[in-house]
UniProtKB/Swiss-Prot annotation:
InterPro entries: MeTrfase_NTM1, SAM-dependent_MTases_sf
Biological process according to GO: chromosome segregation; N-terminal peptidyl-glycine methylation; N-terminal peptidyl-proline dimethylation; N-terminal peptidyl-serine dimethylation; N-terminal peptidyl-serine trimethylation; spindle organization
Phylogenetic classification of the source organism: Eukaryota, Metazoa, Chordata, Craniata, Vertebrata
Reported effect, residue 20 to A/M/Y: Nearly abolishes methyltransferase activity with CENPA
Protein localization: Nucleus
Protein name: N-terminal Xaa-Pro-Lys N-methyltransferase 1
Catalytic activity entry: N-terminal L-alanyl-L-prolyl-L-lysyl-[protein] + 3 S-adenosyl-L-methionine = N-terminal N,N,N-trimethyl-L-alanyl-L-prolyl-L-lysyl-[protein] + 3 S-adenosyl-L-homocysteine + 3 H(+); N-terminal L-seryl-L-prolyl-L-lysyl-[protein] + 3 S-adenosyl-L-methionine = N-terminal N,N,N-trimethyl-L-seryl-L-prolyl-L-lysyl-[protein] + 3 S-adenosyl-L-homocysteine + 3 H(+); N-terminal L-prolyl-L-prolyl-L-lysyl-[protein] + 2 S-adenosyl-L-methionine = N-terminal N,N-dimethyl-L-prolyl-L-prolyl-L-lysyl-[protein] + 2 S-adenosyl-L-homocysteine + 2 H(+)
Outcome when changing residue 168 to K: Loss of methyltransferase activity
Family (UniProt): Belongs to the methyltransferase superfamily. NTM1 family.
CC per GO annotation: cytoplasm; cytosol; nucleoplasm; nucleus
Organism of this sequence: Homo sapiens
Top-level division of the source organism's lineage: Eukaryota
Residues annotated as transmembrane: none
Outcome after substituting residue 177 to N: Strongly reduces methyltransferase activity with CENPA
UniProtKB keywords: Acetylation, Methyltransferase, Nucleus, S-adenosyl-L-methionine, Transferase
């Protein structure tokens, strides 16, 4: 549990905000120096997501997606805009969202909203999104705030909509990264939080072909 590794919740959030403010608004910056894995990540995410967009009568719609912890829009540009009519982005770092407007280019016109907000304080509009994509950002929320955020996301899904979490998984327990002020949870902890948010796990998949030295990365589809 995050309560065991986070001594001061307020400082946990403020330190992360300060950390991201000094990160360059580039793909390499978004990926902590691992910009070269971006295509591997996006291609796997596309396959994972398309199984829900292609299903029969219960298939997920393609009207609007929400990119959480969007940064400069790496995922919006390469995964979401090609598949959805419109996308909203939310990130705590204003400079990233400003840079996104340049980075996204012409297709960026289909980004409806750029929300500058931490996810612990963000409430997505009810009944608005077919897909809510939450990647490499859940570690910046406490367990309680993550469960509460997922509940709010559940309420903002359109019929047959899904939430996707894609993130690092620890081998065991919860590990604090003091540099960027985030935590890495193991699979059981993440599944428990998902369950406590009243969500069902539709699919779970481990990302392949990543460098050996980084955490295992898993995707979860939820509803």
């Amino acid at each position: 549990m995050t309560s065991e590794v986070i001594e001061d919740e307020k400082q946990f959030y403020s330190k992360a905000k300060t950390y991201w403010k000094q990160i360059p608004p580039t793909v390499d910056g978004m990926l902590g120096g691992y910009g070269h894995i971006s295509s591997i990540d996006i291609n796997s995410s596309r396959k994972f997501l398309q199984r829900f967009l292609r299903e029969g009568p219960n298939k997920t719609g393609t009207s609007c997606a929400l990119d959480c912890g969007a940064g400069i829009g790496r995922i919006t540009k390469r995964l979401l805009l090609p598949l959805f009519r419109e996308v909203d982005m939310v990130d705590i770092t204003e400079d990233f969202l400003v840079q996104a407007k340049t980075y996204l280019g012409e297709e960026g016109k289909r980004v409806r909203n750029y929300f500058c907000c931490g996810l612990q304080d963000f409430t997505p509009e009810p009944d608005s999104y077919d897909v809510i994509w939450i990647q490499w950002v859940i570690g910046h929320l406490t367990d309680q705030h993550l469960a509460e955020f997922l509940r709010r996301c559940k309420g903002s899904l359109r019929p047959n909509g899904i939430i996707v979490i894609k993130d690092n998984m620890a081998q065991e327990g919860v590990i604090l990264d003091d540099v960027d002020s985030s935590v890495c949870r193991d699979l059981d902890v993440v599944r428990r939080i998902i369950c406590s948010a009243g969500l069902s796990l539709l699919a779970e998949e481990r990302q392949e072909n990543l460098p050996d030295e980084i955490y295992h990365v898993y995707s979860f589809a939820l509803r």
